[in-house]
């Protein structure tokens, strides 16, 4: 889910703010989701 993804990114990139940057990323990172994922990151949010 998005919270887990956020925590992984924060661990890998300290000081980052992933929820601000990835909330509406691609087709699945954010609220809802449909269609074909645009890349591996979007696929992870699925």
From Swiss-Prot:
Q: Which cofactor does it need?
A: Ca(2+)
InterPro entries on file: PLipase_A2 (IPR001211), PLipase_A2_dom (IPR016090), PLipase_A2_dom_sf (IPR036444)
Reported tissue expression:
Expressed by the venom gland.
* Cysteines engaged in disulfide bonds, as pairs: 29-45
Question: Can you provide one Gene Ontology molecular function annotated for this UniProt record?
Answer: toxin activity
Q: Give its localization.
A: Secreted
- Catalysed reaction, written as an equation: a 1,2-diacyl-sn-glycero-3-phosphocholine + H2O = a 1-acyl-sn-glycero-3-phosphocholine + a fatty acid + H(+)
| GO CC terms in record | extracellular region
User: What is one process in the GO biological process aspect for this record?
Assistant: arachidonate secretion
Q: What family is reported?
A: Belongs to the phospholipase A2 family. Group I subfamily.
Please identify the protein, giving its name as recorded.
Phospholipase A2 superbin c
Taxonomic placement: Eukaryota, Metazoa, Chordata, Craniata, Vertebrata
């Amino acid at each position: 889910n998005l919270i887990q993804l956020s925590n992984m990114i924060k661990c890998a990139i300290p000081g980052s703010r992933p929820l601000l940057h990835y909330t509406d990323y691609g087709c699945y990172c954010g609220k809802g989701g449909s269609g074909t994922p645009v890349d591996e990151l979007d696929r992870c949010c699925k």
